Regions:
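Flexible, glycine/small-residue-enriched loop-and-beta-strand segment within the central core
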Residues: 1-66, 92-93, 100-101
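C-terminal end-helix/capping segment
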Residues: 83, 87-104
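C-terminal/domain-terminus segments
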Residues: 65-90
């Protein structure tokens, strides 16, 4: 977990073993051929995990992502974009494969 002050986790959230929450990444818009990537500055963005989310084992949540209420992130997924509520998202990068009706 990086920059924990940028991470918001709702109620009844399951974050399973080996999950990484990354609030920073290298800003590759500054990259130049022949220079080390490590010379690129870090950019930071928050992660917001809403109520009732399940994040499967070994998943990676990238900076700037919001995971909607009741969503399920499949094991080993890399979440690079916002995930809507009440769905299942899997893969690298994570894509929605199923949606659920909110019964409330």
């Amino acid at each position: 977990m990086s920059a924990p002050e940028l991470i918001t986790i709702g109620k009844n959230v399951w974050v399973t073993r080996g999950v990484m929450l990354l609030c920073h990444q290298r800003d590759l818009s500054f990259y130049e051929i022949g220079k080390p990537v490590m010379d690129c500055p870090l950019k930071f963005a928050p992660i917001n995990i809403k109520d009732g989310v399940h994040v499967g084992i070994g998943s990676i949540i990238m900076p700037g992502v919001t995971i909607g209420e009741g969503a399920v992130i499949g094991a080993g997924s890399v979440v690079t974009r916002d995930i809507p509520p009440y769905c299942v998202a899997v893969g690298v990068p994570a894509k929605v494969i199923k949606t659920f009706e909110n019964k409330e």
